[in-house]
């Protein structure tokens, strides 16, 4: 079975898993719009959900002429750049060599292949050739030569779709990337909640649910790490979604550095989502021939509440993310002395703990903080190996 199809007549990209459908369409003026993500829809193409009407004070692209019904400010799009009349949050912001900060991304080409795309030096899901299919869509700024390769891999039996973006400069002048999200998605006319997991030292992974209103909402980190303060995983769901019932969408960024997850509910009730590297103090210059790859977002959809979504991620990470010989066998068990002794230990105490660990079948004993010189508290001897 083909899990990714392109319907030439309708110009629709149709991505399927066993329990979800994801569709995009190339519309007027080579604009790539987002159509649908959710329950399977059989052979249907969801092309009638986009309603083009005149929205006051929402501008229209130059190519549209006097047609006031086609506005990038209200269309559900797949991946947008700043400076084209769409004033919502966006996926890409750049600075051109002449100081311009716009990029006008137009559909250029696509390719469907077997297997999973790869990202250089970044963690990502992996697959055997028969476990996944990949779609690569190329959007191009025809003035600067900057291209955005939108990468999608479908894991049909896991109900997972992964996304990433590869930026490539083909023009003669350099382009500085100021913001490069790994994914962007629009939901039409939907009242949604966001579920995220905040925390602090000793109080990690606290769930919080927020109603999304007509405003911007975000979670993220600029600590250099994803941190226990905000996990790079967010769920969007319907207002009535519970553990065993309701629609929910998971977004997990496979990256442990600065990150952001942002939403915006716009003037007509559409919800836009972006996720990726936090743009705070971010800048990456691309000379001709250079590329930049974003981290991967692992997406999934469940029509059966949070429990089903959780199990989808468990299976995906266990089978296609963790690279370890222990994926399918019991892992070694270790004991750490820290909570048992803190700084107050000697050789006899440590030997006793290790001996008891061996007696009950544990595999390793780990000596924690305090083995330095006169390391009796947090204020002395850290790093003193004498």
Give a label for each model feature.
Residues 19, 165, 289, 335, ...:
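Conserved, mostly hydrophobic/aromatic
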Residues 1-13, 270-287:
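Short acidic, Pro/Gly- and aromatic-enriched capping/linker segments at domain boundaries
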Residues 4-6, 10-14, 18, 22, ...:
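Polysaccharide-binding surfaces and accessory modules of carbohydrate-active proteins
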Residues 161, 176, 293, 360-361, ...:
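Short loop/turn motifs at secondary-structure junctions
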Residues 31, 155, 299-332:
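Terminal connector regions
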Residues 326-386:
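Aromatic-lined carbohydrate-binding/catalytic grooves of carbohydrate-active enzymes
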Residues 263-265, 277, 304:
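Conserved mixed alpha/beta catalytic, RNA-binding, or beta-rich assembly cores of soluble enzyme
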Residues 95, 100-109, 284-303:
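Short Pro-Gly-centered flexible turn/kink motifs
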């Amino acid at each position: 079975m083909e899990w990714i199809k392109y319907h030439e007549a309708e110009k629709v990209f149709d991505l399927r898993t066993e329990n979800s459908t994801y569709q995009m369409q190339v519309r007027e003026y080579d604009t790539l719009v987002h159509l649908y993500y959710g329950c399977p829809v059989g052979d249907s193409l969801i092309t009638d959900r986009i309603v083009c009407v005149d929205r006051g004070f929402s501008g229209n692209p130059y190519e549209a002429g006097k047609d006031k019904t086609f506005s990038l400010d209200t269309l559900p799009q797949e991946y947008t750049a700043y400076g084209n009349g769409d004033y919502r949050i966006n996926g890409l912001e750049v600075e051109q060599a002449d100081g311009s900060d716009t990029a006008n991304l137009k559909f250029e080409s696509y390719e469907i292949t077997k297997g999973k795309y790869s990202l250089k030096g970044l963690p990502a899901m992996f697959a055997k050739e028969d476990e996944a299919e990949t779609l690569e869509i190329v959007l191009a700024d025809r003035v600067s030569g900057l291209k955005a390769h939108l990468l999608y891999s479908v894991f049909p039996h896991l109900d997972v779709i992964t996304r990433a973006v590869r930026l490539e400069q083909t023009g003669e002048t350099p382009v500085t990337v100021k913001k490069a999200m790994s994914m962007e998605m629009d939901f039409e006319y939907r009242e949604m909640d966001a579920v995220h997991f905040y925390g602090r030292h000793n109080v990690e992974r606290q769930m919080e649910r927020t109603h999304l209103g007509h405003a911007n909402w975000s979670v993220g980190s600029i600590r250099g790490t994803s941190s226990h303060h905000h996990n790079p995983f967010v769920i969007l769901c319907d207002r009535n979604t519970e553990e065993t019932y309701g629609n929910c969408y998971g977004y997990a960024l496979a990256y442990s550095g600065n990150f952001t997850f942002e939403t915006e509910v716009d003037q007509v009730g559409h919800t836009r989502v972006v996720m990726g590297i936090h743009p705070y103090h971010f800048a990456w210059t691309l000379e001709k021939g250079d590329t930049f790859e974003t981290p991967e977002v692992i997406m999934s959809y469940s029509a059966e509440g949070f429990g089903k979504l959780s199990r989808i991620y468990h299976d995906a990470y266990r089978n296609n993310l963790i690279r370890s010989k222990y994926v399918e066998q019991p892992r070694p068990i270790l004991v750490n002395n820290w909570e048992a002794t803190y700084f107050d230990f000697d050789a006899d105490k440590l030997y006793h703990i290790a001996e008891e660990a061996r007696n009950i079948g544990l595999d390793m004993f780990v000596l924690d903080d305090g083995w330095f010189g006169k390391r009796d508290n947090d204020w002395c001897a850290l790093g003193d190996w004498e």
